[in-house]
Amino acid sequence: LLGLEWLIVALSGSNFFLYSLTSSHTLYNISYFFDAFSRAFGFPIIAIAGLMSVTHGYKPSTLADAGLFVASFAATFVLVAVDAVVPAKPWFYLLMWTVYSVYLSYFAWRLWRAGESGHALGLFLVMLCGQAIATIYDFYKIPGDDKEHTLFYILALSTWACMLTQTYYAYRALEIDGKDPEGISP
């Protein structure tokens, strides 16, 4: 689950980069769709489900994984295509990212409890930065930023890159820590 979501983030970023070079609206639309997917469902639902494999021993079937992605893609299509949801989208994105942040806080606590204080602190810090980016995204303009939002994207992309990297190492730390997902040894 995590790998597929990270692939979607890479596709979104790659398409946005190519759009910035070519001004192709098709590339922008692809990037916009994948960005909406990740903000609304990819991180808050799919990434949490993936992280739950080391916090709760959650192992969904291939069919459940596929169903989760199909439902998330369908819901993203509604978010992107239906004009009636436009006024609520920024608030929905912020709510969903906040759900993800709450789970990352729990994940950091689990790391701390497992004796992985460095990973716990790193994950908590990138969670705070990610929550700040999610709050700024649709609601605030950074003073001095240009019409292309260059400063915002430098901060956002740097934060997301650090978040993905820290999440990978945090996941591995809990996975290596033990096979008992609740931390209760026999």
Predicted regions, residues:
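Membrane-proximal helix-loop-helix units in multi-pass membrane proteins
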Residues: 40-113
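Membrane-interface segments at the starts/ends of alpha-helical transmembrane spans
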Residues: 28-31, 75-82, 145-154
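Helix-loop junctions on the outward
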Residues: 12-38, 84-87, 142
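Hydrophobic alpha-helical transmembrane segments of multi-pass membrane proteins
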Residues: 2-21, 34-41, 95, 125-139, 154-158
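Membrane-interfacial loop-to-transmembrane alpha-helix junctions, especially the N-terminal start
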Residues: 1-8, 58-69, 116-126, 181-185
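C-terminal transmembrane-bundle signature of multipass membrane proteins
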Residues: 47, 108-186
